[in-house]
């Protein structure tokens, strides 16, 4: 199937695509419901120099990743856009609430050929709640802000500096993102 990006941006020759057709609302709501009983741990860090500011996450097994239809659709979309095969080497779900401190970071080395997939899985999101993912160039200018609409998927080169902003004070729902870290399949 052909998936069409709603937004397509290049930041310093690295791609970023945003899709509204890779994850269904029903799928996102199902994942969200499962999170209510998940064992989140506050052990995730953005960068080594920010390790005193940990945030909540729950890791997924390779088997759990493979059972998610959105994972397979994301892999297919990347294959269609890049003509290359990728696979997940890590999957997890981030949890952020008002007052959490989240830091800018990259997900891979500048010369690595890796992608990150972010799936926004809150069943509803109000624009006033904040929670956008911001993407930066090497001058620390924000080039693109991805609104965390329910079931939205952002796929981007892992070397793009980015940050997920925590929700604003009026938001009482956690900002959940399902993340897949992808590496190129070697033959």
Q: Model regions: which residues?
A:
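Catalytic core of non-heme Fe(II) oxygenases with the double-stranded beta-helix
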Residues: 76-187
